[in-house]
Amino acid sequence: MKRIAVLTSGGDAPGMNAAVRAVVRKAISEGMEVCGINRGYAGMVEGDIFPLDAKGVSNILSRGGTFLQSARYPEFAKLEGQLKGIEQLKKHGIEGVVVIGGDGSYHGAMRLTEHGFPAVGLPGTIDNDIVGTDYTIGFDTAVNTATDALDKIRDTSFSHGRTFVVEVMGRNAGDIALWSGIAAGADQIIIPEEPYDIKEVVANVKNGYLSKSKNHHLIVLAEGVMHGEEFAAQMKEAGDNSDLRVTNLGHILRGGAPTPRDRVIASWMGAHAVELLREGKGGLAIGIQNEELVEHPILGSAEDGALFSLTEQGEIVVNNPHKARLDFAALNRDLSN
């Protein structure tokens, strides 16, 4: 394989640039040429493809976001979009692709491989919701950013004797809420993976003020449960009479310089992706499990360790869907009592 390409797709995540840098420099060391694809699959279809060299990826290791930019492009799920993208890849002499992104990005990598273009997926999302890996690129940075914000919110919460509901990103996964909540000493953490009783939430707030002689209360809410304002309204309906405020950390969690951990795992995965393509291997996703690099087929059977399967109707289903660590949820309950 003489020329490969790299793209970032879906929501941006700190560490994506580190992965791109590793792909480029590892490929060059292996005597391969590398192209960057701007704006993910949209840029592939439109032919927004350009050569990359070592100088082009210098000074991006510590930058947040993705210098290749990203875009959601649902049209690539259709055969017409895939064929247009493949036409552009052939036009630029590209023989393999490294795809950095989430579930939807993996589906695109799977389709490319089916059409004869080996593609390797790297888990790039702050949500940490990709199957086949303990950690995704960007998750550690997002947790650090959220924890820093929660520490600051606790300061003002204490100063004014208030209850705060802090909504954090994560899509349908509660990992960011859980990890940052424990790190910040949250009084309650509400995540999609674990049911909650709003009356119990309110009772915990009241008990915290009364029995613990605390003058403030911090609740971390994963966006996959509901929005913060809606949750606060439920609390008021259930009898909460505290001085309640709502804060949504929003997209701040996607930005900022990646942590050393995110830089290292992104570099590790990016370099390994090149090794797989050099061997002509595609249709694989790289992950980290028990601090070791692992590879899983993107499409296949659950028994074979594949991340996704196809139903008889041709629908893509997730094998062994990701779940937040509920033992961590139990830990938080023990520590907040």
Curated annotation (Swiss-Prot):
GO BP field: canonical glycolysis; fructose 1,6-bisphosphate metabolic process; fructose 6-phosphate metabolic process
EC top class, as a word: transferase
Main location: cytoplasm
Ways its activity is controlled: Allosterically activated by ADP and other diphosphonucleosides, and allosterically inhibited by phosphoenolpyruvate.
Sequence positions that bind Mg(2+): 103
Keyword Acetylation: no
Catalytic residues identified in the record: 127
Record pathway: Carbohydrate degradation; glycolysis; D-glyceraldehyde 3-phosphate and glycerone phosphate from D-glucose: step 3/4
Sorted UniProt keywords: Allosteric enzyme, ATP-binding, Cytoplasm, Glycolysis, Kinase, Magnesium, Metal-binding, Nucleotide-binding, Transferase
UniProt key word Hydrolase: no
Cofactor(s) in the UniProt record: Mg(2+)
Pfam family, one: PFK
Residue numbers binding ADP: 21-25, 154, 185-187, 214-216
Known catalytic reactions: beta-D-fructose 6-phosphate + ATP = beta-D-fructose 1,6-bisphosphate + ADP + H(+)
Subcellular location: Cytoplasm
Record-listed ATP binding positions: 11, 72-73, 102-105
GO terms under cellular component: 6-phosphofructokinase complex
Family annotation (NCBIfam families): PFKA_ATP, PRK03202.1
Function: Catalyzes the phosphorylation of D-fructose 6-phosphate to fructose 1,6-bisphosphate by ATP, the first committing step of glycolysis.
Subunit relationships: Homotetramer.
PANTHER family, alphabetized: ATP-DEPENDENT 6-PHOSPHOFRUCTOKINASE, PHOSPHOFRUCTOKINASE
Protein name as catalogued: ATP-dependent 6-phosphofructokinase
Naturally occurring in which organism (per UniProt): Streptococcus mutans serotype c (strain ATCC 700610 / UA159)
Gene: pfkA
